[in-house]
Amino acid sequence: VTTHVLEFADVHYTYPGAAQPALNGVTMAVPAGRRCALLGRNGCGKSTLFLHANGIFRPHKGQVLWKGVPISSRRADLQALKRNVGLVFQDPEQQLIAATVAEDVSYGLCNLHLPEAEIREKVRRTLEAFGLSEWADTPVHHLSLGQKRRVALAGVMVMEPELLLLDEPTSYLDPWQTEAFVRQLERIHAAGTTIVMATHDLDFAYAWADWVFVMDAGRLVLAGEPERVFARRDILEVLQFKRPAVLELWESLPGHVKERLGPGLPKTTGELAERLRLL
C-alpha cells in the first residue's frame, strides 16, 4: 500500500492583484520515501505549491494534508508542519540570515528552545555531515554560491524533516558542484527522507527521480514513474518540453540493437554508451 506524506486537495491560491490564480485546483499526493521531480514552465505554480507545503502560505480554497490529517491554521499545527517539511529556496540569500555558518545552521533549533548542549551537538553533527565544519565560524557572505546552497540545506536538515522540498537547487551550479550536491541528496534520501525537487532540467529529472509530477497553469497535469510520464509525447509537446536526450537516442536505435542491450530503459547517455560498448 502506497502511503503519502503530503497531499493537496483542490488547492486554490491567487496572489493579491493577480488576474490568474497561481494554484487552480491542485490535487496531488507525495508518496513516502520517493525521490520526486516537480516539472513545469516558469509561472506554473511550483514555488507557490512549495510555500503551501510547509505552511508559509494558506490556501484560499481546498486543503493541505500531512499524513492524511488536514493542516489547520493553529500555530502549533503550522510549527509542527515546518519541522516536518523542510524547504530550501532557489536563492540561498533568501534563507541565510545569521552572521556565520554555525549560527545560521543553529537558527531553527534555537527557535525550538532546545537545551544549548543539544543544539551544539546537532549543529556539530550536521556541519560534519555536510562538510562545513572548517567554515563553522566563517561569515556567510564570504562563501561561494555552491557553499551557500550547502549551508541552506544544512540549516533545513538539522531539523530532521521527513520531507525535503528543493526549489531549483542545481541552477547556477557548475557540473562538479551539481555532482557533489546530488551525492548529498542521495545520503539524505538513504537516511529515510522523502524529497521533492522542482527543476527545469528534464535529463536530470529522468535520471534522478523515481516519481515525477508535471504542473501547468496552476494544475497538476501528469504524475507517475519517469518512464510513463516521459512517454506522454502529446502532453510534453503542448508544454514545449524536450524529452530526455537518452530516450530520444534509445528510440533512434534499431530494434535488434535494443534487444541486445538488455531489459530496462537506460537512465543516462553515459549508461547507454556503456551498454553499447559492451555489445
Residue ranges and their predicted role:
Residues 139-143:
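Conserved ABC ATPase signature
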Residues 39-41:
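The feature captures the beta-strand-to-loop junction immediately N-terminal to the Walker
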Residues 199-200:
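H-loop/switch region of ABC-family ATPase nucleotide-binding domains
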Residues 54:
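Helix-to-loop junction immediately C-terminal to a conserved catalytic motif
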Residues 164-167:
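Catalytic Walker B motif of ABC-type/P-loop ATPase nucleotide-binding domains
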Residues 62-73, 81:
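Conserved ABC transporter NBD signature motif
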